[in-house]
């Protein structure tokens, strides 16, 4: 599946000044097989954007276009516009939500008051999977998200915050979406929990899922994603290579995007193939990255 957002505008309160838009003419594309980071401070528009991609919200202006292949391998296109233009197509919202999954930051609100197994089975059955097959799927998926079989018989109230997020991911996976958005999946987790969560997302990406990770934590995403969409005040102010953004010192400082752990950040860059020397400050690190990017550009 491919998603195209075209000049999306969202205003929650029409009485507010016109410049106070939750989303302001947002245009971008999400292609099949990408692993993207959506970065921005709290209130920048990340979550509102995600809700539009999943048709939980409909735009006040602009449109969202979905391109996908149906069960007969025929290419389909669905365009979501302002509600009054979209009423005749509301029946297709379920098709969008089947193909575009979302795991929100407060995952407990996506879980039912029943066993984890029943929760996962419900997602599979809702998509037409026979119940006996759905039970097998639940057993496979629970291990995919890093939990053992014993968790299937537990209730959400017995789980930690990180475990609830993993179970929420399992419930979405049971519906087998093409694209999965994760809204602040590492928020509130300790370093070990953060690493495990990112490893799960990377595993899903390698299995062919399109993964979009929304976060305000730059350190969490640099090792895992190559494309970054940066939101500020409801607008996209950067959409491109994750590491190229580091070449602009002024941009990083103005948007409070500096990495918090210089040593850890340097090690991540080396791991993905950037030969960074023993820099002593963020400014030196940015300067060296700038030279490397320029060298690669000249080589191309």
UniProtKB/Swiss-Prot annotation:
Keyword match Translocase: yes
Keyword Transmembrane helix: no
Residues that coordinate or bind ATP: 40-47
Predominant localisation class: membrane
Subcellular location: Cell membrane
Keyword vocabulary terms for this entry: ATP-binding, Cell membrane, Membrane, Nucleotide-binding, Translocase, Transport
Pfam families the UniProt entry points to: ABC_tran (PF00005)
Function noted in UniProt: ATP-binding (A) component of a common energy-coupling factor (ECF) ABC-transporter complex. Unlike classic ABC transporters this ECF transporter provides the energy necessary to transport a number of different substrates.
Record family assignment: Belongs to the ABC transporter superfamily. Energy-coupling factor EcfA family.
Protein name as annotated: Energy-coupling factor transporter ATP-binding protein EcfA2
Lineage: Bacteria, Bacillati, Mycoplasmatota, Mycoplasmoidales, Metamycoplasmataceae
